[in-house]
Swiss-Prot record:
It comes from Aeromonas hydrophila. This is Metallo-beta-lactamase type 2. CDD domains: CphA_ImiS-like_MBL-B2. PROSITE patterns: BETA_LACTAMASE_B_1, BETA_LACTAMASE_B_2. One of its GO terms (cellular component) is periplasmic space. It is an enzyme of class 3 (hydrolase). Substrate binds at T135, H174, K196, N201. NCBIfam families: bla_B2_CphA (NF000329), bla_class_B_core (NF012229), bla_subclass_B2 (NF033087). Pfam families: Lactamase_B.
């Protein structure tokens, strides 16, 4: 009887530790680090550094950004399983480019839903081959990935995890379709490829509309403690929005 009680107590302790575990787990080219509560940032250093996010919910996990390829998605999943054994429920394609949607095939293979706006899904369907070719031009080692479309498509803004993960569109910027993802309880904003330390690649950007999109974001007056940049160093305060707006206003318009 005592042994059984001890086993139950130990199992409960393991569950409790898993529920409140914080810190960072790492692999060769990737890390998963707690930002606040159930919100974690992924620093993916394969190809060109990109930063994605993971939300550990009560019933399962939401991944924000599919990562570069099925192989990098698999690496992220290994890190996720070191934090929680709960299933990955869904993965958000935050825009139609390879760094945000290249891992779709892996996530679908484990039964996760791949989620996007209709605008992102339509751009993937029409322009995926072009985006892969563009990626391979700069990164010859990048694989020639086939198109894997999202299987859950929203006509506009959407929420997941019972409102604890909010995805919204503010206008064209780095791409025509890019969305922000906001975690209201933690006051964390994921800037996607729209916000980052450096100006970055503007090949598909609407440079003229970009500042207006950032002004619309600021007009929402979201309570924000932390902004996660989509590339470069991930952790910033809300001042990253004004910082990038100044960069884009100074950029040449084609």
């Amino acid at each position: 009887m005592m042994k059984g009680w001890m086993k139950c107590g130990l199992a409960g302790a393991v569950v409790l530790m898993a529920s409140f575990w914080g810190g960072s787990v790492r692999a060769a080219g990737m890390s998963l680090t707690q930002v606040s509560g159930p919100v974690y940032v992924v620093e993916d250093n394969y190809y060109v550094q990109e930063n994605s996010m993971v939300y550990f919910g009560a019933k399962g996990v939401t991944v924000v950004g599919a990562t570069w390829t099925p192989d990098t998605a698999r690496e992220l999943h290994k890190l996720i399983k070191r934090v929680s054994r709960k299933p990955v429920l869904e993965v958000i394609n935050t825009n139609y480019h390879t760094d945000r949607a290249g891992g779709n095939a892996y996530w679908k293979s484990i039964g996760a839903k791949v989620v996007s706006t209709r605008q992102t899904r339509d751009l993937m369907k029409s322009d995926w081959a072009e985006i892969v070719a563009f990626t391979r031009k700069g990164l010859p080692e990048y694989p020639d990935l086939p198109l894997v479309l999202p299987n859950v498509v929203h006509d506009g803004d959407f929420t997941l995890q019972e409102g604890k993960v909010r995805a919204f569109y503010a206008g064209p910027a780095h791409t025509p379709d890019g969305i922000f993802v906001y975690f209201p309880d933690e006051q964390v904003l994921y800037g996607n490829c729209i916000l980052k330390e450096k100006l970055g690649n503007l090949s598909f950007a609407d440079v003229k509309a970009y500042p207006q999109t950032l002004e619309r974001l600021k007009a929402m007056k979201l309570p924000i403690k932390t902004v996660i940049g989509g590339h470069d160093s991930p952790l910033h305060g809300p001042e990253l929005i004004d910082h990038y707006e100044a960069l884009i206003k100074a950029a040449p318009q084609s």
